C-alpha cells in the first residue's frame, strides 16, 4: 500500500494532499512527478524512522529524477540516513555527490564537517592526537565553506573555529 494511503499523521497527510495538488498543476512530465512521489514517500518514511523504506523510496526517486538540483536533495537525505546509522563513509560519499550537483548546499558541507569532527573525537579518545588534528582540520575546512554560504547559521561551528584557532575570520560574509 502506498505510504500516502496509510498516513495517519495530520501534518504529513496535509503535506501529502498539498503535494498531490501541486503535482497536478505543475507543468512537469510524468517521470518527474513519479520521482517526486517517491521522494515525498521517502521523506515521510524517514520522519517516522523507517529508514529501509525511506532508502528504497529515495533509490526509486533517484532512478527517475533527472534534474541535478532535485537529485542533490535526494542524495543529501540518503546521506542523513547513513550518517544516523553510523555508516559515515557512505554518508560522506552521498554528501559529496550532492555537493557536486548543487554547490550551494551548506547543510551537506556542515554534515561532512560534523562527521570529520566526530571521527576526530574518536581518534582523540584512542590517543591518536595527530590523526585527530588532521580530522579536526578537515572539519574546519568544511565548516568554513558552509559558513561562507550561510553566514547566519552554524554558530556553534563558528565558535569552535575561533576557540580552536582554526579561523582568524570574524565575519564570514
Curated annotation (Swiss-Prot):
Membrane protein topology class: Peripheral membrane protein
One GO process term, biological-process aspect: photosynthesis
Main location: membrane
Alphabetical UniProt keywords: Membrane, Photosynthesis, Repeat, Thylakoid, TPR repeat
GO cellular component: plasma membrane-derived thylakoid membrane
Gene3D superfamilies per UniProt: Tetratricopeptide repeat domain
Localization annotation: Cellular thylakoid membrane
Origin superkingdom: Bacteria
Each TPR repeat, start to end: 35-68, 72-105, 120-153
Family: Belongs to the Ycf3 family.
Function according to Swiss-Prot or TrEMBL: Essential for the assembly of the photosystem I (PSI) complex. May act as a chaperone-like factor to guide the assembly of the PSI subunits.
Protein name: Photosystem I assembly protein Ycf3
Organism: Cyanothece sp. (strain PCC 7425 / ATCC 29141)
Amino acid at each position: 500500500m502506498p505510504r500516502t494511503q496509510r498516513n495517519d499523521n495530520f501534518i504529513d497527510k496535509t503535506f501529502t494532499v498539498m503535494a498531490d495538488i501541486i503535482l497536478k498543476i505543475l507543468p512537469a512530465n510524468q517521470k518527474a512527478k513519479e520521482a517526486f512521489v517517491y521522494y515525498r514517500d521517502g521523506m515521510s518514511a524517514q520522519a517516522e524512522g523507517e529508514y529501509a523504506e525511506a532508502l528504497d523510496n529515495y533509490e526509486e526517486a533517484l532512478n527517475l529524477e533527472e534534474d541535478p538540483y532535485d537529485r542533490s536533495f535526494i542524495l543529501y537525505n540518503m546521506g542523513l540516513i547513513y550518517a544516523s546509522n553510523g555508516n559515515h563513509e557512505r554518508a560522506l560519499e552521498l554528501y559529496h555527490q550532492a555537493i557536486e550537483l548543487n554547490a550551494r548546499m551548506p547543510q551537506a558541507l556542515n554534515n561532512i564537517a560534523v562527521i570529520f569532527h566526530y571521527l576526530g573525537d574518536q581518534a582523540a579518545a584512542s590517543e591518536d592526537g595527530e590523526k585527530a588534528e588532521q580530522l579536526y582540520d578537515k572539519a574546519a575546512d568544511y565548516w568554513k565553506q558552509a559558513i561562507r554560504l550561510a553566514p547566519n547559521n552554524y554558530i556553534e561551528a563558528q565558535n569552535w573555529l575561533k576557540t580552536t584557532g582554526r579561523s582568524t575570520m570574524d565575519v564570514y560574509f
